[in-house]
Every structure is written in C-alpha cells, then in structure tokens.
Amino acid sequence: MSMTPREIVHELNRHIIGQDDAKRAVAIALRNRWRRMQLPAELRAEVTPKNILMIGPTGVGKTEIARRLAKLANAPFLKVEATKFTEVGYVGRDVESIIRDLADAAMKMLREQEIIRVRHRAEDAAEDRILDALLPQARVTSFSEEAAQTSSDSNTRQLFRKRLREGQLDDKEIEIEVADAVGVEIAAPPGMEEMTNQLQSLFANMGKGKRKARKLKVKEALKMVRDEEASRLVNDDDLKAKALEAVEQHGIVFIDEIDKVAKRGNVGGADVSREGVQRDLLPLIEGCTVNTKLGMVKTDHILFIASGAFHLSKPSDLVPELQGRLPIRVELKALTPEDFERILQEPHASLTEQYRELLKTEGLNIEFKADGIKRLAEIAYQVNEKTENIGARRLHTLLERLLEEVSFSAGDLASAHDEAPIQIDAAYVNGHLGELAQNEDLSRYIL
C-alpha cells in the first residue's frame, strides 16, 4: 500500500459521504502497514498494529468503509460477522476459522495475480495445443502427404493461428485431452470446515494428473486449456510461502456486529456463550499461532478492525481485555438530511445514477431534479426519525417505492415519452411517497 493517508481518504470520499474521523483512522492504519515494512527487521517485529473499534448507528457507512478498504488494500482482507462464531465447545464455527479463511483469501488473491502475470505464456501454450488438435484434420482434408512435409506446414499453422485469434474457428468441434477434475462435495456440520477442506484436498490430489479426451468447441476448449496451462505455470510451493507472508505481515480482518456479542448488563443464559466468543477473540487479536492450509500463521501483525452499532449495549460492555486490544475508537455520526442529499448525488455510481442507467437500457430516460432529490432526502430522514433508524439503507427502500411503477412499465413508457425524460421533482416525490411518509403506521411497514 503505497498510497498516502490523504490519497486513501480521497478514494474513500468517492464512495462514502461524511464520516471523516473513521476514514482518517483507517487511512492511517493502512499507511502504517507500509511504514512498518520499511523498518529494519529487528524493529519491524516489535511494531504491532493499532486495532480499531468503529462505533455508530446502522447504515452510516461502517460496512461500506470495509468494502472499499478491501479493494484499496491489495492485501489479504476478510470481513466476518461476530455473530457467526461460537465459543469453543458449542456447535458452530470457532474464531480460529477467521485466520483459516484469511489464509484462503490470501492464496486466492495471489493465485489470481500470478495467473495474470503468466497469462501471455499460457495463451501461447493453449493456442499450440488447440492447433495440434486442429491440424491433423486440416492435413487430411486439404493437403497431400508430400505437401505436409514441406515448409507450407509452418505457413498453414500460422494461417490457422490467425484464424483462431480472429474467432473464425470458435464453433468448430475438436477432440482434446484435458485434466479430469475430481470434484467431491462433502456435507459436514458447522464447525468442521477444516476437516472438510482436508478431505476435499485429499480427493483432489488423488485425481491429479488424470486426463481424458473430450469433444469441445474451439472457444470452450481454448478457455479450458488456457486455465490449465496457467495453473501449470504457477508454482504452488512459492505461492504458499508468499501467501503465508502476506497474511502475517499485511492481513486485515474486519469484524462486523461486534456489539451483538457484548454482554448486556447482568443478563445470564445465552450471554455466557457470547462472552466466550469475546474471550476466544482475545488471543487472536493479541497474537497467537493458528494452524492453516499454508502452515502455522502468527497473528501478531494482523490488523483487526471491529465495528458495531451498540444500540442495546455499550462499548464498555465488552470484556475489559478486548477493549484494551482495540485502542483506537472512532465514532460515526448519524446522517442528516444534507448527508442523504449528498449520498443520492455525489458518490461514484450513486443510487440515482444506477436507476437512471438501468432504465436507459429500455430506452427510458429519467431525470432527478434538485428539488426532487432534496424532498427524497427529507422523507428518508423523517421516516428514520419516526421509525427505526436504518441510515442510508432507507434510501434503497424509498427509491424502489418511488420508481416501482416506472420500472414495471418502462418499455411502454419509453414508447410514449419518445426521448423526453421523466422528471423526478418534488411534486413527483410527494405524489408517490408523501402520504406514506405522513402516515406513521404505513411508513413503519412499507417504507
């Protein structure tokens, strides 16, 4: 990650409105990963990441920050829900599976990068194999045995290669030998994913090297052979070593819904298991060693970002040891009508742009006017205040309701309006949503 904190925040601003404190915190944490790697090895081992706790109501951008961060980081990244895990001894997934999943994500990411790197060599090798399958047929039907021995053989191959690249042979059927994939589906109860993965790897290795002849169209065969050649060019042992280092030095884990495993007051019963999940998370965040497919992974330098709405509980309800392991606290603010207005217009691929482009595919143009967007933002804010506050997610519900009739009759409306756009102004919004927004009982169930 060679981007500066300012550049990271600028990139996040393209997709997320407001929440500057949270953006700055994750930008600094991400940049510190790069800074640490520039230190001498001895000092580098001592510098541990400062984990982050993001606190804020639902729908204000916590999860969206995680999603965008994953694309920016170019590092092994995993987002998990804290509620999916149970204390060791209970039925369900244990928290160590987080690191196993992170290791799988690292392996997948590096394999994809490596396949892109060797793509050109794989394409050349795949073309040669397809031409080997094609040319015997061409020789029999088009050339005499004497001509096959001359230099015209090379010319023919080049001619066929040109036709292959231009797609002229895509529909021709050929018989070619490809790897025989052994796929075994194993159903196992929750919490036994590691055993399932090991069994699947075992069966996959048993079938490795087996090949069978298949009749395929050239287009399908080329794709299959290209993937096969790319996999052959990738060295799995090197990849595992790189993935192990990437997880340990650059891994990022985003734990959502951390508030749902916080103990609320002095409630007993099921909350015992919740506290158990927190205690199981402690060694993971503090630094321990977890057995994965890649080998033993040390979690000392993995960055953990936790987030929660904390509606029914407080950050102080987390066990004290876990609070201490999340030293950076960031509070995300509830959204205002002005924020809703900006969310509808400013982000890259904003909601209004998405609907506009979707309907354009049917030849129907819609235009969101400034007063219409303002009224929509006001209604979203009012409904959130009167009912449950679900933040920016309310806009999805409102826009679906607002454009339901237009979406249903898009084809007919496109013919009727020719190229004139449908104007979505304040009057249009009030006509479709005004009554629902005013009626609290209706808005509770419909909006």
UniProtKB/Swiss-Prot annotation:
Gene3D superfamilies: 1.10.8.60, DNA helicase RuvA subunit, C-terminal domain (1.10.8.10), P-loop containing nucleotide triphosphate hydrolases (3.40.50.300)
Pfam family, one: AAA_2
GO annotation terms (biological process): protein unfolding; proteolysis involved in protein catabolic process
A Gene Ontology molecular function term of the record: peptidase activity
Residue sites binding ATP per the record: I17, G59, V60, G61, K62, T63, E64, D256, E321, R393
Broad class of the protein's primary localization: cytoplasm
Purpose of the protein: ATPase subunit of a proteasome-like degradation complex; this subunit has chaperone activity. The binding of ATP and its subsequent hydrolysis by HslU are essential for unfolding of protein substrates subsequently hydrolyzed by HslV. HslU recognizes the N-terminal part of its protein substrates and unfolds these before they are guided to HslV for hydrolysis.
Matches recorded under PANTHER family: ATP-DEPENDENT CLP PROTEASE ATP-BINDING SUBUNIT CLPX-LIKE, MITOCHONDRIAL-RELATED, ATP-DEPENDENT PROTEASE ATPASE SUBUNIT HSLU
NCBIfam families: hslU, PRK05201.1
Protein name: ATP-dependent protease ATPase subunit HslU
